[in-house]
Amino acid sequence: MRAEAAGGGFRDDARRLLRVSYERQVAGGGRVTHVDLGAGAEDLGMDAAGHRFAALLDYVEVMGWAEKDLFAQDASGGAVRRITARGLAVVGEA
């Protein structure tokens, strides 16, 4: 996954990360309002501790696609994100 100079690739990468994380959560029978973006990053072959992931995570939050759920944690102890209505719309984009 790489950002393109025009920035369109960055949005696409963030959307792909959100979609993969959401689909993983649904397939696992988990709460469909929550997404583990770190696990989604690993599914995409991305380092969940890397700078690229951190930038995509910030992008997802700034765009309002997901927000931190301070009462839930993922397997690594990080905050799980709650997907928003805007995020669900992004996941549903073709």
Predicted regions mapped to residue ranges:
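A short, conserved structural fragment
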Residues: 61-72
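Short amphipathic alpha-helical interaction segments
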Residues: 46-63, 78
